Swiss-Prot record:
This is Photosystem I reaction center subunit XII. The lineage of its organism: Eukaryota, Discoba, Euglenozoa, Euglenida, Spirocuta. The gene is psaM. The chain crosses the membrane at residues 7-26. SUPFAM superfamilies: Subunit XII of photosystem I reaction centre, PsaM. It comes from Lepocinclis buetschlii. It holds the Pfam family PsaM.
Length: 31
């Protein structure tokens, strides 16, 4: 099974989006 650049980017996005949301939420709560 080959992994294409598109699949890698998709996996990165799926991994990053919850992290970014949690980071922004933490910043909001820290104010």
């Amino acid at each position: 099974m080959e992994i294409t650049t598109t699949q890698v980017l998709g996996i990165l996005l799926i991994a990053l989006i919850p992290g970014i949301l949690a980071y922004r939420l933490a910043n909001e709560l820290a104010k």
